Amino acid sequence: MQHKRSRALASPRSPFLFALLALAVGGTANAHDDGLPAFRYSAELLGQLQLPSVALPLNDELFLYGRDAEAFDLEAYLALNAPALRDKSEYLEHWSGYYSINPKVLLTLMVMQSGPLGAPDERALAAPLGRLSAKRGFDAQVRDVLQQLSRRYYGFEEYQLRQAAARKAVGEDGLNAASAALLGLLREGAKASAVQGGNPLGAYAQTFQRLFGTPAAELLQPRNRVARQLQAKAALAPPSNLMQLPWRQGYSWQPNGAHSNTGSGYPYSSFDASYDWPRWGSATYSVVAAHAGTVRVLSRCQVRVTHPSGWATNYYHMDQIQVSNGQQVSADTKLGVYASNINTALCEGGSSTGPHLHFSLLYNGAFVSLQGASFGPYRINVGTSNYDNDCRRYYFYNQSAGTTHCAFRPLYNPGLAL
């Protein structure tokens, strides 16, 4: 592969155009891909998802794996309320964290589709999410529904950003990404008795409140907040001195092209990195926290670190995790190593082509584009497609030295920007 040097691209003036640099137009996976295309919304489809005039949209932050999910002890909740599901705790936590969907959302949908969690019958264990998924088996349905919710959520955000960039009104109907994702999924499974007619989001909100005691004022949000939130999100980038690269200071690793968390669709929130991109069974190296924050161990192979500001980073395909839930870490604290064994790297299933770290950027539980994000002195330009490795479009720009660094070339980690 030939890597060309290029000058840093000028930043567009509009935050919506800035965000559009991260919209997906295809691409080929190098290391990690769920294999499903992005969910595409249209005006016609959205016309079928109108909120009832008396309904309020759901709070995005309670839909996503953000502060509320991080404070939720899923294993303890299942032990008390659903002992038959306790052995599924890590599986639920892992995939909820991977798709960054609050596990409370999943449990609420289970109750709506198959009844109380306390004593599920054989049918409920085989198909806990009923007609919301065409898959069979507990694990398959759980992952399928989380994947559907994620695709719908980010597909809606992408559609809104395109509309805003075209100077079309967005958010005025009060429909936000969380509401669109859940409403669309529930109406897909409308033959299930729990969501026949009426307001399926109302039934969802009531069930959520009953299960977790969340006040309506927290679960719902005013309609007029939707457009403001979109505009704020379009211009998001972490503070330039908050993060470093996720490997040891003083070392050089090779990152690949930016891509979505799943390898297809929007936003380009992630990149994969490895010391030397070896085969399975080869030596692997230390993964460190890119910034200070609180640890959440999502599974044996996945960790998240969340800064008090709401910025977070996710670390997947891990091994030898040496931090624990609630632990406070600083930048460059060792979290573990990236796994050299495929079964360890994919501790709850999935796909991967070889040993590497899958690294993602989030804000308040939502995956956000790496466009313009700084890691030490390097500012990222994400390119125009998933896994875009062309250095004319995707690169790390060293703001101190004025140099451009391409994909699959060693990238030195000097630490945090001064």
Curated annotation (Swiss-Prot):
InterPro entries: Cell_wall_metabolism_enzyme, Dup_hybrid_motif, Pept_M23A_Blytic, Peptidase_M23
Entry keyword set: Disulfide bond, Hydrolase, Metal-binding, Metalloprotease, Protease, Secreted, Signal, Virulence, Zinc, Zymogen
Top-level enzyme category: hydrolase
Propeptide residues according to the Swiss-Prot or TrEMBL record: 32-236
Positions contributing to Zn(2+) binding: 259, 272, 358
Molecular-function annotations in GO: metal ion binding; metalloendopeptidase activity
A cellular component term, taken from the record's GO annotations: extracellular region
Function, in words: Involved in proteolysis and elastolysis (degradation of the host protein elastin). Has staphylolytic activity (degrades pentaglycine cross-links in cell wall peptidoglycan), preferring Gly-Gly-|-X substrates where X is Ala or Gly. Enhances the elastolytic but not proteolytic activity of elastase (lasB) and elastolytic activity of other proteases. Degradation of elastin is likely to contribute to the pathogenicity of P.aeruginosa.
The protein's name in its UniProt record: Protease LasA
Gene: lasA
